[in-house]
């Protein structure tokens, strides 16, 4: 009876807090600006540029050089983009795509699979999708006044996230040994 009561509690419902789309080009310049245009076209928001933390001579990357761009999407737009991204992956994710904190991420090879028309001047970019899940009440950890921690029982675990993915999207979770072709 206690477990049935726990499942019917609306505070236990899991929702998407945010979706982060990331394109890591590995160099600054024209390719990075074209990648930012792809993200802007996809999300309708202005992307933010990420800088290299340190110099890697073998890759030709200097410290503080802009090498990637990302955009954080929330709300209904995040759900639409997540749906289209999962459609490209055919609703199949690996078990290792899920973190212990209840987040998950995956990548796609070509942005044109999301429904954007191919533009020869832009090219084709792959991107990463990172999804952060939360329950109602997570605000207590983010607010400015009376900040406190989310209780261990209320946190989203890896198993919770995988179950949410399987129920909401009727997704398939594969083990590491199985290969995904595509």
From Swiss-Prot:
This is Large ribosomal subunit protein uL5y/uL5x/uL5w. Signal peptide: none annotated. The gene is RPL11B. Pfam families: Ribosomal_L5, Ribosomal_L5_C. The keyword Nucleus applies. Component of the ribosome, a large ribonucleoprotein complex responsible for the synthesis of proteins in the cell. The small ribosomal subunit (SSU) binds messenger RNAs (mRNAs) and translates the encoded message by selecting cognate aminoacyl-transfer RNA (tRNA) molecules. The large subunit (LSU) contains the ribosomal catalytic site termed the peptidyl transferase center (PTC), which catalyzes the formation of peptide bonds, thereby polymerizing the amino acids delivered by tRNAs into a polypeptide chain. It comes from Arabidopsis thaliana. Disulfide bonds: none annotated. The keyword Cell membrane does not apply. GO terms for cellular component: cytosol; cytosolic large ribosomal subunit; cytosolic ribosome; nucleus; plastid; vacuole. Keywords: Cytoplasm, Nucleus, Ribonucleoprotein, Ribosomal protein, RNA-binding, rRNA-binding. One of its GO terms (biological process) is translation. PROSITE patterns: RIBOSOMAL_L5. The lineage of its organism: Eukaryota, Viridiplantae, Streptophyta, Embryophyta, Tracheophyta.
């Amino acid at each position: 009876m206690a477990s049935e009561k726990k499942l019917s509690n609306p505070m236990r419902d899991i929702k998407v807090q945010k979706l982060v789309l990331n394109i890591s080009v590995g160099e600054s310049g024209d390719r990075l600006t074209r990648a930012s245009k792809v993200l802007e076209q996809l999300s309708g928001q202005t992307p933010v540029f990420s800088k290299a933390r340190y110099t890697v001579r073998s890759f030709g990357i200097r410290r503080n050089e802009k090498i990637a761009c990302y955009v954080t999407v929330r709300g209904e737009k995040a759900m639409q983009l997540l749906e289209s991204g999962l459609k490209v992956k055919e609703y199949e994710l690996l078990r290792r795509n899920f973190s212990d904190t209840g987040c998950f991420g995956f990548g796609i090879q070509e942005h044109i699979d999301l429904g954007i028309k191919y533009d020869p001047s832009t090219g084709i970019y792959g991107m990463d999708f990172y999804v952060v899940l939360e329950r109602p009440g997570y605000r207590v950890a983010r607010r400015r006044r009376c900040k406190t921690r989310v209780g261990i029982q209320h946190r989203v675990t890896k198993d919770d996230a995988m179950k949410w993915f399987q129920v909401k999207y009727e997704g398939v979770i594969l083990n590491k040994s199985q290969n995904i072709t595509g």
